């Protein structure tokens, strides 16, 4: 699955991974090592990176997308840039985050591209999001069905703009090669954050979920997304999008499955949308008072409402262009739960 341009006698290609300690990033690092890459892993915290990677043969680069100059020297000698880092909804503490979204997802993207080009990097896989796409309820959405900025929330809008930055760069630099992978709601082992996906599993396992939230998602294993990212190097086309969104799942089906796999009783009641908005409003207030991450942000509640049954995404390019298949949902959740137990999140 590695880049076919690399001969057997050539030194192992050097990969630079942003967001390396995140759910996707750490699974990508492991997949790259398995494919024979040398890996430079960007992390804001060296201690967190050492805990996450536990002695794996990688080079940890300490740095932050808000200060790209602090790690720019580590970009020299890199063959491929994998950009998984972003400011996203799981980072929210309630309130308005437009400034951070623009700074990290859009402006830092442009600076990273410019700096990488100057360092000699000519290949990149950018992790975008299903947020840049939109279709009608129940419709199968493919990579061509773009969401308009004027109908996007701040996070969705920032991902649309980050893609535009990359496409503009590709137009200006014909020698630069890049494509985009669009994940769904990622689950899987290694979710040390945890993300909203992992927190949902933990809440069900701990019996803390008061009811089943409304809505639907497109759920994917982070390891499958990592494989798609690597497959793009040999099978992807310049400037193209590749959905790695997984499968449509209603929360009404997903929550009982998690409960069964964690030996818990599933919540018996469903949370109506009006009540979800009340919970989100109260969570925003609590987050502002405590400065802790919001349990249910207003943006998340709005997204659940607006995106309900808009989680049917095409897997054609994933299957036919990249030659991949999604692993069973139960396997993903079982591995995720087992990892949480091993890591001490669950007994």
Regions of interest found by a model, annotated:
Residues 228-298, 315, 321, 328-347:
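Mid/C-terminal beta-alpha module of Rossmann-like enzyme folds, strongest
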Residues 174-176, 188-199, 232-242, 264-266:
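Glycine/proline-rich active-site loop of Rossmann-fold NAD(P)-dependent oxidoreductases
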Residues 13-35:
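N-terminal Rossmann NAD(P)H-binding glycine-rich loop of SDR-like oxidoreductase domains
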Residues 83, 87, 98-99, 103-155:
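Conserved Rossmann-fold NAD(P)-dependent oxidoreductase catalytic core, especially the SDR/UDP-sugar
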Residues 93, 147-150, 199-220, 224:
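A conserved pocket-lining segment of Rossmann-fold NAD(P)-dependent short-chain dehydrogenase/reductase
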Residues 54-107, 115:
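NAD(P)H-binding glycine-rich loop region in Rossmannoid oxidoreductase-like domains
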Residues 111, 196, 213-234, 240:
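Substrate-positioning beta->alpha
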